[in-house]
Regions:
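Extracellular/oxidizing-compartment recognition motifs
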Residues: 1-84, 88-508, 516, 532-535, ...
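Alpha-helical support elements that line or immediately flank enzyme active sites
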Residues: 174-179, 189, 374-393, 442-447, ...
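Active-site acid/base region of carbohydrate-active enzymes
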Residues: 183-184, 283-290, 449-489, 495-496, ...
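Flexible loop/turn segments at secondary-structure boundaries
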Residues: 184-186, 195, 235-239, 396-398, ...
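Active/binding-pocket-proximal capping segment
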Residues: 185, 193-196, 200-201, 541, ...
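C-terminal capping/lid segments that line or modulate ligand- or cofactor-binding pockets
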Residues: 228, 304-305, 509, 519, ...
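Non-catalytic C-terminal accessory modules of carbohydrate-active enzymes
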Residues: 256-267, 277-313, 339-341, 348, ...
Length: 916
């Protein structure tokens, strides 16, 4: 049995951990289908040599348990700051055979209560200059930050550098840099990037929290001179519109900068082989100058004058005598917190699939795929030549960049980059440092592919997909090309919206709207490992929550909204939905402690918004039903309220707050009763079955698919009426001609209901998806789209929205047939798509315990071949409908002669034949 994939819940990287409570996890692999973990031991030590025998930090001892996730480590004395810790897992199987993991490590920073402070205090005569009144007088110097925020006092991008001469002849063992630059920064050491990250640090409410990043630069550190360089741009911290499009200022000018001075800090921790340690900090000894990037508008307008670029500025030997000393700055108000979520990195490279000269000096390049990108342009020409680079998801009939929504024409002409050539080398290369967009098309003006023109020459145009570094998890493929194309469009829509937060679109808005976070979580967890992203989003929600308990519709809240665009439970519910989803998908309760009280405050706030004894109906309803504002407020919002209360009760139980569990359980039961009192129609005078109505048209008893789906999926239907409500749901589908009659909220529960084992109508799902006219996914694809649009319309402002992507969940759970049952897929169900039109389906889900693989194929003889890989430490329940039985491929111990009986498949690989 091999111990693999060791990690720490809530942390993607581990170079700067700032908490004394960690939760470990690991996975196992074994070719023995009977192998089971029966015990484990975890050791943690600052001395690698004592890890097994005398760990100096923590030793779990041998624990009789099969648990592999959510293992709490909380040393009595905490962890020392700026220290490398090693940890290892030993497991024993049922035969007392032991296996050890490789040695893992993490590096600590400072306690989360610490923050950088203003460099000078009014009271510095009486107190240390790094103090803030009394607090840091009593703070252990080893446990607090020593660096100060620095910059040049301006709000335009800057370069900062620090030359470090050797201070010791001792051998360097490890070099770690903690740094942050607001809004975003790139760090380099000796002329090379410190990491593959882009857009560090993650976006937060900088008044509350500022993320710092940890970099291990040991391999780049020299025993001679060293140079640390930082390039800092605006981001959302000090957003710079320039003369371009900037969404927070587009309609109502409610954006307020967090700060007006771009700022940076760094601590470089150099550890020597004799155990000594020195710290190099950001202070006025650093040098600063303006950047060659003259505008860093995060909405993809990033100007760059290559003539101003100081070649070699971040490497040893550069003459910085004309640079100015950095100024100490006050910096942001927020506390420093380690960037725990996955960084943003560059993924796929796109090269143009076609190009077209629109007119002399203007060329359009088609990348073939819409996605979130950072473009890369290689051009050469005379110094001072200006190149304009535009981006678009759409082109007009002539092939020029185009915004089809007339209300957003400013986006068409107001988003561009001006690149001024240096003309001193064979090629001038530009790629953005501080911005990104979503685009399929890149239009270049002022240059030509024809080297005989009197214009600068375009040598290369490419683009890199930019997204979170979170682990990619799987795929689904069928024998239907239109379905595969839709799966692909969903994937690119999701991947293009995952950064340090989950946004709804990477070009027009870039905001952290919370409904996509919670609504799409069951689908997104098939795209990427989202645990650390969701944990960070919950931190954003805590920072954004208002004093009365309200959770706004976005976090961070970069732009103040009002009315239902500010207060809607289908957005705010992320505070109560995400913790339970993290437990369900990743087997961790790490977030419960920090989010529990904020959840209670939100429920108390929502109680003040109840009407008619418990209904909630003040929000956006089924947003996106008719382009924007929706309906079914009482049905949707009250159902979500009910589920929030149930989730808080579950958290209370997990945390041992039994009185609270009883309180919220009773509260939820009250809402259940009120919901059915006002919305369930049982008299059968208008229809021969019970059904749910909306309150959209008082006095009428409408019967819609969304009203039935919400009640069914949230467990609000009394058992005696469940069959009736399913009948009402299918009747509503039939009455619509199997057309989608749902906005983005109802859409998810529409698909979930059609996948419900008691309904199981994949034919209706595909008929809805394939409609000729909107609402229709396939209409998007027939018109050449490669991602999902914002609304059910052709001329849409945003063509890389993921909010309509809830059907992606259906592809995994109802087509591939894989669905988690126990936490983290410890047990999972497999429901092969017997009732569907698919002849072949295959796919993978890289679950927390290991890789799940499924291949379903109908044969010419009429039976089905089903290949299944069940990871170690998990059990699959193969769900068979009536009339289906396994005729070969089962080991003797799980043989069954019954027809239509669920089969428990223990870990292992199976090649089954099923007879229909």
């Amino acid at each position: 049995m091999e111990v693999t994939r060791c990690g720490i819940h809530g942390f993607h990287e581990t170079i700067g951990l700032d908490t004394d409570e960690l939760r470990f996890f690991w996975a196992l692999q074994s070719s023995n289908s009977k192998a089971q973990q029966v015990a484990y031991r975890i050791t943690v030590s600052s001395d690698k040599g004592t890890l097994n025998e005398r760990p100096d930090a923590w030793d779990s001892g041998r624990v009789q348990s099969d648990a592999q996730r959510n293992i709490i480590c909380k040393p009595k004395s905490g962890f020392k700051s700026t220290t490398t810790y090693y940890w290892q897992v030993t497991v024993w199987d049922q035969d007392e055979n032991s296996s050890q993991s490789t040695v893992n490590e993490f590096y600590t920073s400072y306690p989360r209560s610490s923050r950088l402070l203003p460099p000078y205090s009014m009271n510095q005569t009486y107190m240390p200059h790094t103090s803030l009144i009394f607090r840091t007088w009593f703070e252990n110097e080893a446990d607090r930050w020593k660096a100060v925020w620095i910059g040049n006092g301006g709000d335009k991008p800057i370069y900062l550098r620090k030359s470090v001469q050797p201070r010791s002849t001792k051998r360097v063992e490890k070099v770690v840099v903690f740094a942050s630059g607001l809004g975003h920064f790139n760090l380099s050491v000796n002329g090379k990037p410190a990491s593959p990250h882009v857009l560090d640090p993650g976006w937060t409410n900088y008044h509350r929290t500022v993320q710092f990043v940890g970099y291990d630069v040991t391999s780049q550190w020299s025993d001679k001179d060293n140079v640390i360089g930082a390039h800092v741009g605006n981001g959302f911290y000090a957003g710079d519109q320039g003369d371009r499009f900037f969404w927070p200022m587009y309609e109502d000018n409610t954006y307020v900068r967090y700060g007006n001075e771009l700022c940076f800090f760094a601590e470089v921790h150099v550890h020597y082989d004799d155990g000594s340690h020195e710290t190099i900090i950001s202070d006025p000894s650093w040098k600063v100058r303006k950047s060659a990037t003259t505008l860093a508008n995060i909405y993809a307008s990033e100007d760059h004058d290559r003539r101003e670029y100081p070649v070699g500025w971040d490497a040893p030997g550069f003459d910085d005598s004309t640079w100015k000393p950095a100024k100490p700055l006050t910096g942001p108000r927020g506390k420093l917190r380690y960037q725990s979520q996955p960084p943003v990195i560059l993924h796929n490279t796109f090269t143009p699939v076609r190009q077209k000269q629109l007119r002399p000096g203007v060329t359009m390049f088609d990348l073939g795929q819409n996605s979130s990108i950072m473009p890369r342009i290689e051009v050469n020409g005379p110094a001072g030549s200006e190149i304009i680079i535009r981006y678009s998801e759409t082109v007009d009939d002539d092939g020029a960049v185009f915004m089809p929504d007339p209300l957003f024409k400013e986006f068409e002409y107001g988003v561009y980059t001006k690149f001024i050539l240096a003309g001193t080398s064979d090629k001038d290369i530009w790629m953005p440092d501080f911005s990104f967009t979503s685009a399929r098309y890149i239009q270049i003006e002022g240059a030509s592919l024809d080297r005989n023109d009197d214009l600068p020459t375009i040598h290369s145009v490419t683009a890199r997909h930019v997204s979170s570094a979170a682990r990619q998890l799987g795929y689904v493929k069928t024998d239907k090309q239109d379905v595969n194309d839709l799966i692909n469009a969903c994937y690119w829509s999701f991947s293009s919206n995952i950064f340090s937060y989950h946004t709804d679109c990477p070009q027009i808005e870039k905001f952290g709207w919370l409904e996509v976070t919670s609504l799409l979580a069951p689908a997104t967890q098939y795209v990427r490992d989202m645990e650390a992203v969701y944990s960070k989003i919950l931190d954003d929600i805590i920072d954004t929550q208002e004093s009365n308990g309200l959770v706004p519709t976005m976090a961070p809240e970069i732009r103040y909204m009002c009315g239902p665009l500010h207060d809607t439970i289908t957005w705010g519910c992320a505070i109560a939905f995400l913790p339970e989803l993290i437990k369900q998908y990743y087997g961790s309760t790490e977030v419960f402690g920090k989010i529990y009280q904020p959840c209670i405050r939100y429920m108390e706030y929502m109680k003040t918004r109840e009407r008619q004894g418990g209904l909630i109906e003040h929000g956006l309803g089924d947003w996106g039903r008719d382009i924007a504002f929706g309906n079914h407020q009482a049905n949707i919002e009250t159902a979500v309220y009910y589920q929030c209360l149930r989730n808080v009760a579950l958290m209370a139980k997990e945390l041992g707050h039994l009185d609270d569990e009883a309180k919220f359980t009773a509260w939820a039961e009250r809402i259940y009763a009120v919901y059915n009192k006002h919305l369930l129609i049982t008299d059968k005078t208008s229809r021969p079955y019970a059904f749910y109505t909306s309150l959209d048209n008082p006095g009428t008893h409408d019967c819609t698919m969304v009203a039935q789906a919400m009640a069914l999926q949230f467990g609000l239907v009394p058992a005696e009426y469940r069959a009736d409500v399913i009948k009402a749901f299918l009747s509503a589908c039939e009455a619509s001609g199997n057309r989608i009659e749902a906005g983005e909220i109802g859409l998810k529960y529409l698909w979930n209901t059609l996948a419900d084992p008691d309904v199981n109508r994949p034919d209706i799902v595909l008929e809805m998806a394939r409609q000729e006219e909107h609402p229709s996914y396939m209409r998007f694809l027939r018109r050449g789209e490669t991602t999902l649009l914002e609304f059910w319309q052709d001329a849409c402002r945003s063509k890389c929205h993921d909010m309509l992507g809830t059907i992606y969940e259906w592809f995994y759970e109802a087509v591939l047939g894989v669905k988690p049952v126990g936490d983290a897929y410890s047990t999972w169900a497999l429901r092969p798509p017997f009732a569907s039109e698919f002849g072949l389906v295959e796919g993978e889900v890289d679950s927390p315990y290991g890789l799940i693989k499924v291949r379903f194929e109908r044969t010419a003889g009429g039976d089905v071949r089903l290949d299944v890989r069940v990871p170690t430490s998990t059990t699959c329940t193969l769900v068979l409908p009536a009339g289906v039985r396994v005729v070969s491929g089962l080991p003797a111990e799980v043989q069954t002669s019954s027809i239509g009986e669920d089969v428990a498949l223990p870990q292992g690989t199976y090649q089954l034949v099923l007879l229909l």
